């Protein structure tokens, strides 16, 4: 009976161990921000979301609705892709801060599997007062 209990415990622990379904990175500062995205699983697709936070009272926040960003993807083989996206800056607010979170890309299946580098650069044309940094959330889906 003791052996059966040990086997059941071992199988339970074995099944409980799995790779994380995603990862998040938040980088402080005004940019550019460099993230790593592990896309080594060739059977999965990936969802990417950006999030940010501004700490400033409403009167001191710039009336900017969105932040233009250049997003550069660098493959494991050093090939690059680049695009301009606009991150909305108002979703959840309190008196002293506001947070934004937006789905950037859904169901990404890269041609080259491995660890990608994503460099995000804000445009100089927009100044966002109280910007704390930028975060990238990567969710793996099977």
Model-derived regions: residue spans:
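An anionic, turn-rich surface loop/hairpin at beta-sheet edges
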Residues: 83-111
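Bacterial signal peptide processing site
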Residues: 18-21
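Short amphipathic, basic-aromatic surface patches that mediate peripheral association
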Residues: 50-61
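Short coil-to-beta strand junction motifs in C2/discoidin
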Residues: 60-69
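Noncatalytic modules at the cell exterior or secretory-pathway interfaces
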Residues: 41-50, 108-128
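Post-signal peptide N-terminal segment of mature Sec-exported envelope proteins
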Residues: 26-47
């Amino acid at each position: 009976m003791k052996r059966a209990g040990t086997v059941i415990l071992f199988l339970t622990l074995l099944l409980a161990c799995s790779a994380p379904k995603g990862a998040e990175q938040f980088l402080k500062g005004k940019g550019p921000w460099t993230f790593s995205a592990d896309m080594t699983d060739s059977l999965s697709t990936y969802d990417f979301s950006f999030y940010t936070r501004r700490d400033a009272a409403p009167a001191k926040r710039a009336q900017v609705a969105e932040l233009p960003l250049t997003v550069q993807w660098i493959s494991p083989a050093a090939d690059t892709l680049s695009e301009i996206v606009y991150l909305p800056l108002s979703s959840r607010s309190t008196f002293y801060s506001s947070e934004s979170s937006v789905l950037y890309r859904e169901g990404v299946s890269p041609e080259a599997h491995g660890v990608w580098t994503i460099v995000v650069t804000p445009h100089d044309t927009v100044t966002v007062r109280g910007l704390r940094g930028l975060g990238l959330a990567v969710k793996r889906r099977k």
